[in-house]
Amino acid sequence: MKMKLVTAAVMGLAMSTAMAATDATSLATDKDKLSYSIGADLGKNFKNQGIDVNPEAMAKGMQDAMSGAQLALTEQQMKDVLNKFQKDLMAKRTAEFNKKADENKVKGEAFLTENKNKPGVVVLPSGLQYKVINSGNGVKPGKSDTVTVEYTGRLIDGTVFDSTEKTGKPATFQVSQVIPGWTEALQLMPAGSTWEIYVPSGLAYGPRSVGGPIGPNETLIFKIHLISVKKSS
């Protein structure tokens, strides 16, 4: 994290210099256009991350360093400033993450409390909920068996985060190699069945951030069609 932030800061100095020295209406050379494009891209990233900097001061620092002029801050002062910046940014990110995790947990619990009273919804001791859409008559898989499924995963607000429809082909995997909510549900499903399962965060990814739309402590919904089961030898 530290090296990434330092690298970003150094790049920022270079890019803001290029932007300050180049009028956006007179990008005559490829070098001008490249410099401007990289600077604009970095500026967007800084804005999206909430990093507040002074472009003029960044440009001045780069110019002084490249020209060999006396720097306005000592090496130790600059190191201290960057270290504080990194520490403050990490604290901010952690606070934002924890707030989001708490919000998702509360929303997920409220959803499950309401959902369990809906017609056809079954609640298991683990907290996993499911509803049978179509009941198959095939074999039920065990933990070590391999299954082939079609599925769509979405958040409780309806956002689809994954689906076999995107790839156009079903997914095949061992029952024990997925999130606990899936492992539990699959072992109850006869092949040929289609279920909708409602997975509490503790049976999904928990407080971890897995990227994409799935945040920490997310309750997840999956529509699963169990196509086939291959028993382990």
Swiss-Prot record:
Name of the gene: mip
Pfam families with a match to the protein in the record: FKBP_C, FKBP_N
EC number, UniProt record: 5.2.1.8
Any one biological process term the GO annotation gives: protein folding
PROSITE patterns: FKBP_PPIASE
Protein role: Essential virulence factor associated with macrophage infectivity. Exhibits PPIase activity.
Keyword annotations: Cell outer membrane, Isomerase, Membrane, Rotamase, Signal, Virulence
Protein's name according to its UniProt entry: Outer membrane protein MIP
Activity regulation summary: Strongly inhibited by FK506 but is completely resistant to cyclosporin A.
